[in-house]
A protein has these predicted regions:
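N-terminal Rossmann-like dinucleotide-binding module
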Residues: 1-49
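Rossmann-fold dehydrogenase core element
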Residues: 6, 106-125, 143-151
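Histidine-centered divalent metal-coordination motifs
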Residues: 19, 78, 183
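Acidic-histidine catalytic/liganding microenvironments
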Residues: 26-28, 63-64, 128
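Short, Asp-centered acidic motifs that coordinate Mg2+ and/or phosphate
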Residues: 33, 68, 148
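Aromatic/hydrophobic pocket-lining residues that form π-stacking "cages" and hydrophobic walls in ligand
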Residues: 42, 81, 108, 133-134
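Beta-loop-alpha module in the N-terminal Rossmann-like domain of NAD(P)-dependent dehydrogenases
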Residues: 49-111
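Predominantly a Rossmann-like dinucleotide-binding segment in NAD(P)-dependent oxidoreductases
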Residues: 125-193
Length: 193
């Protein structure tokens, strides 16, 4: 690379549209290109950021100026994209959860390890200001020794939320437990140690 920035490619422009935008606002990061099957979303991102859009994610993997692939697809598809990106020598940031099956998660970890690339899972709740303050208080011992943690989730979404891939076993895995409660589970692990 001719500069010191890290080149990003984003697969999936549902929630990934926001992550693509963040890549353009992050020091040291450079959004290079995006991939999505939906032409409207692809063209919108391309025009907004002045980058290439592809309807075939493999075009991202072929680019030498992309260092990191952000996988922002339905949860049950994370494995395939991650493994292909690793084989292409790209580091991977996958949105949560890592995948809907432990076997696929293990396959992703193995593929990245064998390729010598980094695999990270995006748990954005860790970066919310209130959560950061609680973590600092825990780490500094201001709350005493943490011995028990509890999380609760009230969850309601209208029927239209579940008309696509959400709520399917293949792509959503376990409904609100895995797709939404994963944040609470991660917070317990992060805060409790």
């Amino acid at each position: 690379m001719s500069d010191d920035t890290v080149g990003f490619g984003v697969i999936g422009l549902g929630m990934g549209a926001g992550r693509a935008r963040l890549a353009t606002q992050t020091a040291g990061a450079r959004l290079v290109a995006v991939a999505d099957l939906d032409e409207e979303r692809g063209r919108k991102a391309s025009e907004e950021h002045g980058i290439n859009w592809y309807d075939d994610y493999r075009r991202l993997l072929d680019r030498e100026d992309i260092d990191v692939i952000m996988v922002m697809t339905p949860s049950g598809a994370h494995g395939d994209f991650t493994i292909e990106a690793a084989k292409a020598g790209k580091h991977v940031i996958s949105t949560k959860p890592i995948d809907v099956s432990l076997e696929r998660a293990d396959d992703m970890i193995t593929a990245c390890r064998e390729a010598g690339v980094i695999l990270a899972v995006d748990f954005e709740a860790r970066y919310m200001a209130d959560n950061v303050r609680v973590k600092q208080a825990v780490d500094e011992g201001r709350l005493g020794k943490m011995v028990l943690g509890e999380a609760r989730l009230k969850w309601y979404r209208g029927h239209d939320y579940y008309e696509g891939w959400h709520g399917t076993w293949k792509y959503d895995g376990g409904g609100s437990l895995i797709n939404q409660s994963i944040h609470q589970i991660d917070m317990l692990v992060w805060l409790m140690g």
